[in-house]
Amino acid sequence: MKMKKKSIFISLLIIGVTILSACGPSYEEAQRMSKAERLKRWREDSLALKIGVTPTLDCLPLYLAEAEGLFDTAQADIRLKRFQAQIDVAEALRKGRIEGCVTDLVRTRRLAKQGFGIHYFETTNAYWQLVSNRLSRVKNIKQLNDKMLAMTRYSAPALLADYAIDSVKLNRDNVFLIQINDVDLRLRMLLNNEMDAMLLTEPQATAARLYKHKVLMDSREKGLQLGVIAFSTQGTKDQRRKKQIEVFAKGYKAACDSLNKNGIKHYAQLLKTIYKLDNKTLNALPDMTFGYGNTPRQKDVNAADKWLNK
């Protein structure tokens, strides 16, 4: 009797497995479905207008537009592609992985000199501060002699580092320029006392000031406006792309208007989510105005070109 029950149980088990196998997709079918889904997503992504952004405050209008649904998704698929370093943003733009980005004038002028077509959409409110480690006892730029200064190559921070060194006639060979591309890593190295000085933009500069690190120079004092939003001319020349940029422009303007009306701290939760800010840093952020309708000034283009041609 026990043997008969056992035989019935095994038979039912085999039937169940057979039914499940017949109903469920085979491994090969699952692979084909997965490949088809990946292809679908790739096609959607390739058709979308992709904008490179970093965890810096010049990108805040884009983050707000995305979070608040200010980009008209019925008319255009606009996607933000997140990076930790501007050098990676520039490379993605060069390789056609993104159509536009929030970046700086030095990087885009360098791309243009390499024959890459650049269309300037907007200037941004980005600025950079040269900050020294309070434990390094560097109180002024002259004391950077034999010190390590973190920056990133072929960029506004690199230009400003040279401006600082030249302003006090330091021997460049005696200031050690260290390439740290990741903006958050650069800040952590200052807070961990691994660097003597560095160029920082917001909100990283605010965090540095909160920890009593000293500001030696501010790019605004030099009269330079180096932050830009730029698009690849190659990736945006057809009518569909132009329509997407029009939709992007409307969303960007609406986000700037909201930020200017309400102030950035009104969007505290977004700032905490995107920039990983604690309350102390959030409350210490400076008031900022976000403009639109401006393209780079010729004097700033000339400054970038002159530095690149050195």
Which role does the model predict for each range below?
Residues 26-171, 177-178, 189, 196-202, ...:
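Short, glycine-/small- and polar/acidic-enriched structural segments
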Residues 19-22:
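C-terminal motif of bacterial Sec signal peptides marking the signal peptidase cleavage site
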Residues 135-142, 165-167, 173-175, 187, ...:
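Proline/Glycine/Serine-rich low-complexity intrinsically disordered segments
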Residues 56, 84-87, 102, 151, ...:
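Soluble non-cytosolic domains of exported or imported proteins
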Residues 105-107, 177-271:
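Pocket-lining segment of extracytoplasmic ligand-binding domains
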Residues 2-10:
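Bacterial N-terminal signal peptides that target proteins for export
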Residues 238-310:
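Secondary-structure end/capping motifs
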